[in-house]
């Protein structure tokens, strides 16, 4: 399997918790609430354009905004470790900014993830 090991997941969750035990507990709870299909599909590289549209739909229909913001932080961490591509981090940060500004979350996810795929092609 190409899923991250439990140790890698914990390491990433600790990193995005910025050393705060309380934040780590919150992040562990959020991680456990995220459906497995979403956890699987956020791995870099993204599969294809159709998968990206389904991923955006699943994220926005199955996760609340706090969970989506957490997921973006997590994706920034795992994608940075894999690619060291600053542009991808900026795109993900842009999605987070858009959804926290109450712009259409699904469109924000679709456009952002499609940008990543286009830059990666």
Model-derived segments and spans:
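Charged, glycine-rich active-site and insertion segments that engage polyanionic ligands
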Residues: 1-121
